[in-house]
From Swiss-Prot:
It comes from the Eukaryota. PPR repeats lie at residues 151-185, 186-220, 221-255, 256-290, 291-325, 326-360, 361-395, 396-430, 431-465. The keyword Aminoacyl-tRNA synthetase does not apply. Belongs to the PPR family. P subfamily. This is Pentatricopeptide repeat-containing protein At1g55630. Keywords: Repeat. Signal peptide: none annotated. It holds the Pfam family PPR_3.
Amino acid sequence: MNSVIHYSTSVAVRKASRFLFTSRKFCNGSIGGDVTDNGTEEPLKITWESSEMDCEFDQEENGEKISVRKRFMESTKLSASRVLDTLQQDCPGFNTKSALDELNVSISGLLVREVLVGILRTLSFDNKTRCAKLAYKFFVWCGGQENFRHTANCYHLLMKIFAECGEYKAMCRLIDEMIKDGYPTTACTFNLLICTCGEAGLARDVVEQFIKSKTFNYRPYKHSYNAILHSLLGVKQYKLIDWVYEQMLEDGFTPDVLTYNIVMFANFRLGKTDRLYRLLDEMVKDGFSPDLYTYNILLHHLATGNKPLAALNLLNHMREVGVEPGVIHFTTLIDGLSRAGKLEACKYFMDETVKVGCTPDVVCYTVMITGYISGGELEKAEEMFKEMTEKGQLPNVFTYNSMIRGFCMAGKFKEACALLKEMESRGCNPNFVVYSTLVNNLKNAGKVLEAHEVVKDMVEKGHYVHLISKLKKYRRS
């Protein structure tokens, strides 16, 4: 810690490092140990880009202006629906290729996207093999059409389908095809692979493949290693991060602030405190000043280590060197201290946040509320919940989940159910964690009928129907 005194006042706030704000990561995880997929949905973010559609050209038709772009999209969606209907007829003896040819649809990147997304939406455990085959069959058919060339996004979307189907070898073959067709693999390509293959225990093989790749387009990162490290951190491959870092040094690449932040954070998560501070010293010796994210890692370490005084000293040091702590740093402290059960210290830093002119945001309030709930102090959590709404901070799905869990722990199921309705009326859609928290607690309390009412309501609204089996002993009637 003494080496911190030698830091210069330069603060390099790097946008690419924003994932290192660990208090924000709090709102991406399950709260209170609910066993679910962290309660988060991971919608595929595929953007449609077409230079031909950068502008909208309106024309007069039947006395009304109709957007050419809008008509194109509506026509494409209709074509996609026809394609999906045709693909569903695929079976032995049915010539799918000829049937698709007879549709005479206009092939475009948007059509490919609509069809593949349509397949992805219908994918289930029972039909995953069929979905993978249909997606690839359609993909190949499109690629064979005159004057059409797949985009990198189309490849990534098909990779996503293969990933959901557990077709790891098919994913790797698709990447080979992608490279053969002249497409550079990107950080997005790697991220899709590592997210899937990491779960299958193939992460190191994938990393080695990309390290050796000559077609890996790692921009906007400084070098390929930073792109790889960034993706590994996103899937919590902390041990592999250390290995990649050593490989990077052996290959003669120099780390930068982003590199150090990632490796330090990984070592923090692995509980390797000594190595964390050795890396910090290396960073300073290499002439790099710690940025806001570096300080956030250190604050998180001190907070989870139950060292509020040392954390306070670090905050003061930050001010001395010209780095003004923000709400994110105070939130990190509150989060770490609440996990250590130090609720009084949490309240102190919450008040300190306001004193220094920072406005606690929804994440800060949610961390504080969750701390109170975990500590069995429901009344204080309710007061904090009321305070945040009065100050214009609208509760998010994680805030509501904490409060619902708190009411359930206190046996106040009527209030918990009322809060579920309140969040829906406010336009805050419950995620699966919220439903499972309420349903499982109701069942554990012997309130089976009430639990089934919640599930029934969830199903009627079309929410998470594919995850019903994860709710304890639930059977659809």
